[in-house]
Amino acid sequence: MERESSKLTRLSVLPQLKIQLQDVRPEGIPNKREIHSIWERKIDLDLNRTYLVRGASGRGKSTFLHILLGIRRNYSGQVLLGEENIRRFCSDKWALIRQNTLAMVFQDLRLLGELTARENLSIKTRLAESPQSKQIEELAERLGVKEQLEQPCHLLSFGQQQRLAILRALLQPFRALLLDEPFSHLDPDNSRICLDLILEICEERNAGLFLATLDDDYGLNPDQELRV
């Protein structure tokens, strides 16, 4: 395990870590090969680039992000991180990847409703060994949720919870940020504020971005658009 952890630490700081999809087809996705779809093709992705993931409901946007994060395994084909097949990663290796390499904002947010907003944020930063109370305050103020930090999450609006989930992801180390329809309950102004902060932090870290959306591109100018 010690050798594997050391290997992952070295892997996570490579300047151009790549993901390759090789003929991937998730179970439950219609078996219909389309010209512009990412399914059943060879696709090379760089973790320091920006991608817009588009598709209608049920076409696999969330599934694609879940495959990258290693939480969905029922698919045919292969996914390589670096030169390694992610199916062969053990649970400890995935835990390290999710702490240091890939961060995600889930569509259902996955906040703990009985805890305060600050407690939800602090749990994640403690797990990532990066206590950042001052940064929490600063970023929460930028996203307009500083006044809600001491409130239980279940009392917040879904839009406020979305901003907290975005903040939680930004506070952890990452090489790429996976966003699953993160602005669905935000007005255009708050969506723009969130996206500006996301792009700013990604640029500071030379990190990549995968933004899944039904249709709206939120003004993002991606390096590549991916269709599912």
Which role fits each region the language model picked out?
Residues 108, 114-127:
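Q-loop/switch helix immediately C-terminal to the Walker
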Residues 86-103:
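ABC ATPase NBD coupling module
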Residues 133-148:
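Conserved ABC ATPase "signature" region
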Residues 177-181:
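Catalytic Walker B motif of ABC-type/P-loop ATPase nucleotide-binding domains
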Residues 69:
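Helix-to-loop junction immediately C-terminal to a conserved catalytic motif
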